[in-house]
Amino acid sequence: MLFRSQQSTSAILPIDEAEPDYLLKIILIGDSGVGKTNLLSQFISHQFSDDTKTTIGVEFATKSLNINGKMVKAQIWDTAGQERYRSITSAYYKGANGAMILYDITSSISFNSVSKWLQELRESTDPNIAIMLVGNKNDQEELRSVKLEEGKNLAEGNRLMFLETSAKEAKNVEEAFHELINSIVECYTKNGITGKEIKRNNIQGTAVKKEEKSCC
């Protein structure tokens, strides 16, 4: 289930009976129509809709995962891609532990916008935030306008993780989220960053400082 919010205030989520080791904030960004809502819906509830409405403001959902023996609750924010909602959505970048930047492989315009989204993300969050570039809708191969190699090269040039997905066919959806979340947990575990540190920084709207504890 997705919960809609058009306000720029922090949302308080219900806590599961078992307190997670890590409560992570993940944001999905990219142009309108690239499939962010369906990607999230497929990951959370294994559902896809051809009639998904354009996201207004911000929606979020949560999912609990076991990552290498760690209980992780991922709080995933689906942001609007339209310019008129930018002031609302950018407010939710603060305190993010990871991000996915989506483009549509059938739309070179959405691919060309990736650099803009990446710049905005890095200006609003910790510059070392874990980021995955996702080329969505690769079930529409006959309409492809962005080559696989173009996505790979852009990701490599900006030190991003990369996968192509199909929210419609559930291809690489689980893999994309798990790879991103796993990379965050591995980084925090390696550097001794605790769930309490992350929770405190998320409440304050800041990322865990990585000058001393860098994942790069």
Residue locations for each model-derived region?
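Switch II (G3) loop of P-loop NTPases
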Residues: 72-85
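WD40-repeat beta-propellers
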Residues: 75-77, 103, 117
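Switch I (effector-binding) loop of TRAFAC-class P-loop GTPase G-domains
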Residues: 45-71
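Conserved P-loop small GTPase signature centered on TRAFAC-class small GTPases
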Residues: 1-33, 37, 67-71, 127-216
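Conserved Switch II/interswitch segment of TRAFAC-class P-loop GTPases
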Residues: 96-115, 125-128, 138-145, 170
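Conserved catalytic network of the ASCE P-loop NTPase/AAA+ motor domain
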Residues: 66-69, 90-95, 122-127
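Post-Walker A alpha-helix
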Residues: 40-41
